[in-house]
Amino acid sequence: MAKSKNHTNHNQNKKAHRNGIKRPLRKRHESTLGMDVKFLINQRYARKGNLSREESVKRYNERIASQKGKPKPVTL
């Protein structure tokens, strides 16, 4: 008996392009539905701890001002 055919790509390209090959829609914020609850709670605290741009710039300027008169640390 002859061996049967294992694979063919016949007509697959036509079938795929019949309705067009579309890119997946880009999601700005991915859904958290079904995600681990423990992770989501931790994520909430992590987001709350982030500083706004203005706050971080203000803290940076304060840090620079406090180091103004001090000598630079010596590295060995």
From Swiss-Prot:
**Basic and acidic residues bias: where?**
51-62
One matching Pfam family is: Ribosomal_L29e
**BP GO terms, sorted:** cytoplasmic translation
Annotated Gene Ontology MF terms?
Answer: structural constituent of ribosome
- Which InterPro entries does the record cross-reference, listed alphabetically? Ribosomal_eL29 (IPR002673)
As given in the record, the signal peptide range reads none
Disordered as annotated region, ranges: 1-33, 47-76
Offer a single GO CC term for the protein.
Answer: cytosolic ribosome
Q: Where is the composition biased (Basic residues)?
A: 1-29
Q: Which family does it belong to?
A: Belongs to the eukaryotic ribosomal protein eL29 family.
Record-given protein name: Large ribosomal subunit protein eL29
Q: Which organism is it from?
A: Drosophila melanogaster (Fruit fly)
